């Protein structure tokens, strides 16, 4: 550990007033210790010390707190697709668990929760919905949950319909306009068109939803199929076509430029 820490310390010391690594690795905060070992030190998944830290992070701290509030059926606060109430229900609990580094291998309750969520929110067409129908899908939810479920270690075969819909919804391949009500695969009032078009954004491309979709597509394991690669290329072109610092992306009238 000390040699690896030394390798990290040199570039950090030029930017910071002190070395944060020893503080991040303190055993009193197992969650922060685990994430620092994984993301800052870059220890491989098979590293014994990292494995022990991950186990401790699941037994104590925020991961354990979130899991202790889960209903035995696999949901938080109320049954169903779990979008509300913000920010305590199933959607937000799963996102938080993913951000904290939780994994299905470490606690059977995580597998229970991801299975329950997919049973209630993933539709046959691959849409991840806030309601019981495909009209409840939107890029920010789709991207957030595909990312979270992938990070948590959810079975990729189970997620494949969501991956395909996510990629197609960006490129528009094989998806009919919302007006074609009888089409087997179409856009809807909220998810209304390709390149992150969103009904809540006056049907214009939404960079906030787009970032979440790109985040999800970027971490898919293995070699991406051509459809996913095309979606990533199209999404990157949209997000990088202007200066990201001032923004300038389409947004609803009356909404703040920075959010």
Where are the regions a protein language model picked out?
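Preference for long, amphipathic alpha-helical scaffolds in soluble/luminal domains
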Residues: 1-259
């Amino acid at each position: 550990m000390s040699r690896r820490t030394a390798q990290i310390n040199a570039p950090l010391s030029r930017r910071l007033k002190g070395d944060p690594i020893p503080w991040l690795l303190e055993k009193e905060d197992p969650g922060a210790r685990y994430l620092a070992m994984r993301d800052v030190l870059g220890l491989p998944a098979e590293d014994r010390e990292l494995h022990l830290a991950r186990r401790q992070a699941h037994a104590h701290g925020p991961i354990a707190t979130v899991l202790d509030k889960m209903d035995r059926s696999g949901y938080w606060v109320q049954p169903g697709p779990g979008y509300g109430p913000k920010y305590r229900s199933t959607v937000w609990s799963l996102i938080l668990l993913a951000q904290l580094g939780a994994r299905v291998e470490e606690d059977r309750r995580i597998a229970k929760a991801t299975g329950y969520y997919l049973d209630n929110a993933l539709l046959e067409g691959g849409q991840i919905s806030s309601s019981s129908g495909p009209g409840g899908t939107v890029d920010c939810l789709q991207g957030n949950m595909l990312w979270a479920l992938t990070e948590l270690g959810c079975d990729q075969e189970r997620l494949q319909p969501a991956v395909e819909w996510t990629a197609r919804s960006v490129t528009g391949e094989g998806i009919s306009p919302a007006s074609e009500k009888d089409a087997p695969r179409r856009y809807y009032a909220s998810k209304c068109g390709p390149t992150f078009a969103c009904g809540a954004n006056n049907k214009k491309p939404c960079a906030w939803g787009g970032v979440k979709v790109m985040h999800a597509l970027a971490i898919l394991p293995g070699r991406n199929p051509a459809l996913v690669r095309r979606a990533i290329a199209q999404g990157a072109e949209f997000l990088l076509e202007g200066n990201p610092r001032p923004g300038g992306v389409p947004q609803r009238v009356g909404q703040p430029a920075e959010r």
